[in-house]
Protein backbone atom coordinates (compact mmCIF):
# COMPACT_ATOMS: atom_id res chain seq x y z
CA UNK A 1 0.00 0.00 0.00
CA UNK A 2 2.82 2.45 0.84
CA UNK A 3 4.35 1.78 -2.56
CA UNK A 4 1.10 2.89 -4.24
CA UNK A 5 1.09 6.18 -2.32
CA UNK A 6 4.74 6.85 -3.05
CA UNK A 7 4.08 6.25 -6.76
CA UNK A 8 1.14 8.66 -6.73
CA UNK A 9 3.24 11.20 -4.84
CA UNK A 10 6.05 10.77 -7.38
CA UNK A 11 3.62 11.32 -10.27
CA UNK A 12 2.13 14.43 -8.64
CA UNK A 13 5.56 15.95 -8.07
CA UNK A 14 6.94 15.09 -11.52
CA UNK A 15 6.85 17.87 -14.13
CA UNK A 16 4.37 17.09 -16.90
CA UNK A 17 3.32 18.28 -20.35
CA UNK A 18 -0.29 18.39 -21.54
CA UNK A 19 -0.30 18.20 -25.33
CA UNK A 20 -3.99 18.11 -26.16
CA UNK A 21 -6.41 20.25 -24.19
CA UNK A 22 -9.55 21.84 -25.64
CA UNK A 23 -9.87 24.95 -23.49
CA UNK A 24 -13.65 25.28 -23.80
CA UNK A 25 -13.94 21.68 -22.62
CA UNK A 26 -12.12 22.59 -19.41
CA UNK A 27 -14.95 24.92 -18.31
CA UNK A 28 -15.86 23.95 -14.76
CA UNK A 29 -19.54 23.95 -13.66
CA UNK A 30 -18.93 26.76 -11.14
CA UNK A 31 -17.52 29.10 -13.79
CA UNK A 32 -20.23 28.17 -16.30
CA UNK A 33 -22.89 29.06 -13.74
CA UNK A 34 -21.14 32.30 -12.72
CA UNK A 35 -20.67 33.48 -16.33
CA UNK A 36 -24.26 32.60 -17.26
CA UNK A 37 -25.45 34.93 -14.49
CA UNK A 38 -22.92 37.67 -15.26
CA UNK A 39 -23.64 37.68 -19.00
CA UNK A 40 -27.39 37.01 -18.60
CA UNK A 41 -27.21 33.85 -20.73
CA UNK A 42 -29.87 31.23 -20.07
CA UNK A 43 -28.58 27.71 -19.61
CA UNK A 44 -30.73 24.61 -19.05
CA UNK A 45 -29.43 24.20 -15.48
CA UNK A 46 -30.68 25.81 -12.27
CA UNK A 47 -27.70 24.92 -10.07
CA UNK A 48 -24.01 24.08 -10.24
CA UNK A 49 -24.93 20.55 -9.15
CA UNK A 50 -27.22 20.14 -12.17
CA UNK A 51 -24.36 21.18 -14.44
CA UNK A 52 -22.02 18.74 -12.71
CA UNK A 53 -24.57 15.93 -13.19
CA UNK A 54 -24.74 16.73 -16.91
CA UNK A 55 -20.99 16.09 -17.13
CA UNK A 56 -21.57 12.34 -16.95
CA UNK A 57 -21.58 11.64 -20.68
CA UNK A 58 -21.26 8.34 -22.49
CA UNK A 59 -19.88 9.30 -25.90
CA UNK A 60 -18.48 12.20 -27.91
CA UNK A 61 -21.87 13.53 -28.98
CA UNK A 62 -23.24 13.61 -25.43
CA UNK A 63 -20.06 15.41 -24.34
CA UNK A 64 -20.43 17.93 -27.17
CA UNK A 65 -23.94 18.80 -26.00
CA UNK A 66 -22.70 20.08 -22.63
CA UNK A 67 -19.56 21.49 -24.29
CA UNK A 68 -21.61 23.79 -26.53
CA UNK A 69 -23.89 24.81 -23.64
CA UNK A 70 -20.72 25.99 -21.93
CA UNK A 71 -19.38 27.92 -24.89
CA UNK A 72 -22.55 30.03 -24.91
CA UNK A 73 -21.62 31.74 -21.63
CA UNK A 74 -18.25 32.96 -22.95
CA UNK A 75 -18.83 36.49 -24.26
CA UNK A 76 -16.20 38.97 -23.10
CA UNK A 77 -12.40 38.89 -23.23
CA UNK A 78 -12.37 38.54 -19.45
CA UNK A 79 -14.49 35.36 -19.73
CA UNK A 80 -11.87 33.74 -21.96
CA UNK A 81 -9.15 34.93 -19.59
CA UNK A 82 -11.00 33.45 -16.57
CA UNK A 83 -11.62 30.15 -18.40
CA UNK A 84 -7.94 29.84 -19.30
CA UNK A 85 -6.66 31.07 -15.94
CA UNK A 86 -8.74 28.50 -14.03
CA UNK A 87 -7.22 25.80 -16.23
CA UNK A 88 -3.72 27.20 -15.57
CA UNK A 89 -4.29 27.04 -11.81
CA UNK A 90 -5.12 23.33 -12.19
CA UNK A 91 -1.94 22.94 -14.27
CA UNK A 92 0.10 24.48 -11.46
CA UNK A 93 -1.52 22.14 -8.93
CA UNK A 94 -0.70 19.11 -11.14
CA UNK A 95 2.83 20.36 -11.90
CA UNK A 96 2.13 20.75 -15.63
CA UNK A 97 5.00 22.86 -16.96
CA UNK A 98 3.93 23.03 -20.62
CA UNK A 99 0.53 22.87 -22.26
CA UNK A 100 -0.79 23.00 -25.81
CA UNK A 101 -4.27 24.47 -25.90
CA UNK A 102 -6.85 24.04 -28.65
CA UNK A 103 -9.66 26.58 -29.06
CA UNK A 104 -12.80 26.78 -31.22
CA UNK A 105 -13.30 30.28 -32.63
CA UNK A 106 -16.26 29.19 -34.78
CA UNK A 107 -18.26 28.32 -31.64
CA UNK A 108 -18.00 31.96 -30.61
CA UNK A 109 -17.88 33.86 -33.90
CA UNK A 110 -21.32 32.46 -34.78
CA UNK A 111 -22.64 34.19 -31.62
CA UNK A 112 -21.11 37.58 -32.49
CA UNK A 113 -18.00 37.28 -30.29
CA UNK A 114 -14.99 38.69 -32.14
CA UNK A 115 -11.88 36.64 -32.91
CA UNK A 116 -9.80 39.30 -31.13
CA UNK A 117 -11.89 38.95 -27.94
CA UNK A 118 -11.38 35.17 -27.89
CA UNK A 119 -7.66 35.01 -28.67
CA UNK A 120 -6.67 38.00 -26.51
CA UNK A 121 -8.39 36.59 -23.42
CA UNK A 122 -6.75 33.19 -23.84
CA UNK A 123 -3.34 34.65 -24.72
CA UNK A 124 -3.35 37.09 -21.79
CA UNK A 125 -3.91 34.24 -19.31
CA UNK A 126 -1.16 32.14 -20.92
CA UNK A 127 1.32 35.03 -20.76
CA UNK A 128 0.47 35.53 -17.09
CA UNK A 129 1.00 31.78 -16.53
CA UNK A 130 4.49 32.02 -18.01
CA UNK A 131 5.34 35.12 -15.96
CA UNK A 132 3.85 33.97 -12.65
CA UNK A 133 4.46 30.20 -12.73
CA UNK A 134 6.91 29.49 -15.56
CA UNK A 135 4.27 27.43 -17.40
CA UNK A 136 4.94 27.58 -21.14
CA UNK A 137 2.19 27.10 -23.71
CA UNK A 138 1.17 27.05 -27.36
CA UNK A 139 -2.21 27.75 -28.96
CA UNK A 140 -3.76 25.64 -31.73
CA UNK A 141 -6.93 26.78 -33.51
CA UNK A 142 -9.56 24.19 -34.39
CA UNK A 143 -12.20 24.11 -37.09
CA UNK A 144 -15.54 22.48 -36.34
CA UNK A 145 -15.97 19.29 -38.37
CA UNK A 146 -19.74 19.57 -38.55
CA UNK A 147 -19.49 22.88 -40.47
CA UNK A 148 -18.74 23.21 -44.17
CA UNK A 149 -15.14 23.69 -45.26
CA UNK A 150 -16.00 26.94 -47.05
CA UNK A 151 -17.01 28.63 -43.78
CA UNK A 152 -13.56 27.93 -42.33
CA UNK A 153 -11.59 30.03 -44.81
CA UNK A 154 -12.80 33.31 -43.28
CA UNK A 155 -11.76 32.10 -39.83
CA UNK A 156 -8.32 31.16 -41.16
CA UNK A 157 -8.05 34.66 -42.63
CA UNK A 158 -8.88 36.24 -39.25
CA UNK A 159 -6.27 34.04 -37.58
CA UNK A 160 -3.58 35.54 -39.83
CA UNK A 161 -3.83 38.75 -37.78
CA UNK A 162 -2.69 36.70 -34.77
CA UNK A 163 0.15 34.64 -36.28
CA UNK A 164 2.29 35.45 -33.26
CA UNK A 165 -0.14 33.62 -30.98
CA UNK A 166 -1.36 30.60 -32.99
CA UNK A 167 1.09 27.84 -33.95
CA UNK A 168 -1.20 25.50 -35.84
CA UNK A 169 -4.67 24.35 -36.82
CA UNK A 170 -6.68 21.19 -36.31
CA UNK A 171 -10.18 19.75 -36.29
CA UNK A 172 -12.64 18.94 -33.57
CA UNK A 173 -16.36 18.39 -32.93
CA UNK A 174 -18.51 15.56 -34.25
CA UNK A 175 -16.43 13.06 -36.24
CA UNK A 176 -19.31 10.97 -37.58
CA UNK A 177 -19.75 11.84 -41.26
CA UNK A 178 -17.06 14.53 -41.06
CA UNK A 179 -13.72 13.00 -42.10
CA UNK A 180 -10.53 15.08 -42.32
CA UNK A 181 -10.65 14.75 -46.13
CA UNK A 182 -13.63 17.13 -46.05
CA UNK A 183 -11.13 19.90 -45.16
CA UNK A 184 -8.37 19.10 -47.67
CA UNK A 185 -8.31 22.54 -49.36
CA UNK A 186 -8.43 24.30 -46.00
CA UNK A 187 -5.40 22.44 -44.70
CA UNK A 188 -3.50 23.02 -47.92
CA UNK A 189 -4.18 26.74 -47.49
CA UNK A 190 -3.15 26.63 -43.82
CA UNK A 191 0.16 24.98 -44.74
CA UNK A 192 0.78 27.71 -47.34
CA UNK A 193 0.25 30.22 -44.52
CA UNK A 194 2.94 28.30 -42.58
CA UNK A 195 0.57 26.88 -39.99
CA UNK A 196 1.27 23.45 -38.57
CA UNK A 197 -1.54 20.97 -39.12
CA UNK A 198 -2.48 18.60 -36.30
Predicted regions and their residues:
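Metal-cofactor-binding active-site regions of metalloenzymes
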Residues: 1-194
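Conserved small/polar residues in nucleotide/adenosyl-binding loops
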Residues: 197-198
Amino acid sequence: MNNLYSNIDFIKKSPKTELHLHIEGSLEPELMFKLSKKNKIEIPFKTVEEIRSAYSFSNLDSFLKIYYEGTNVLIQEEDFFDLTWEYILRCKQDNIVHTEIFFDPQSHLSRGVSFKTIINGIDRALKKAEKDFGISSKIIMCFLRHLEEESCFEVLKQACDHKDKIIGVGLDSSEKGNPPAKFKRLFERAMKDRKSVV
